[in-house]
A protein has these predicted regions:
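Short acidic-hydrophobic, aromatic-tinged amphipathic segments that line or gate anion-handling sites
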Residues: 50-58
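Rossmann-fold NAD(P)-binding glycine/threonine-rich loop
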Residues: 76-122
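Short active-site oxyanion
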Residues: 2-3, 27-30, 66-69
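Beta-loop-alpha module in the N-terminal Rossmann-like domain of NAD(P)-dependent dehydrogenases
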Residues: 59-60, 64-85
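NAD(P)-binding Rossmann-fold cofactor-contacting core
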Residues: 23-47
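Oxidoreductase and adenylate-handling cofactor-binding alpha/beta cores
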Residues: 128-134
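Glycine-rich adenosine-cofactor-binding loop
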Residues: 3-16
Length: 134
């Protein structure tokens, strides 16, 4: 089982959380945001997921064991986060426009997720339309 964290509790992070809950190979163990009053954190609590409003500070203060972090924040914060997670040995799947790691399109180069410390997912439009090219 892959142990995952999500940082960013807005629409993208929350949608991702709901998808991860349904998988049988990824266990979302922490959902990190900035406000306990956010709709995403409230929903995660209802689903029994551990939450925090400490954002990146939670990961700095708590060396919890996760295999991968999904960064659903913004490009500016993702650049700061990438350094912290690299020091901790945590793989990053970046869903922001930061373009820190190699671009990853699972239908084209799925091996990037296994071989790189940080991968940047292309836009949702790109992810959705790429299979049409095959």
């Amino acid at each position: 089982m892959i142990k995952a964290g999500i940082i960013g509790t807005g629409n993208i992070g929350t949608d991702l959380l709901l998808k991860l809950i349904k998988t049988d190979f990824i266990e979302p163990i922490i959902f990190a945001g900035r406000r306990m009053s956010s709709n995403g954190i409230k929903l995660a609590q209802e689903k029994g997921i551990n939450v925090t409003d400490k954002g990146i500070q939670f990961f700095i203060d708590n060396k919890i064991y996760i295999d991968v972090i999904y960064d659903c924040t913004n490009a500016t914060d993702a650049k700061k986060h990438a350094k912290i997670f690299k020091e901790q040995g945590v793989k990053v799947i970046d869903l922001t426009p930061a373009k820190i790691g190699d671009l990853c399109v699972p239908t084209i180069n799925p091996e990037a997720i296994k071989t790189q410390d940080n991968v940047n997912m292309i836009t949702c439009g790109g992810q959705a339309s790429t299979p049409l090219l095959n």
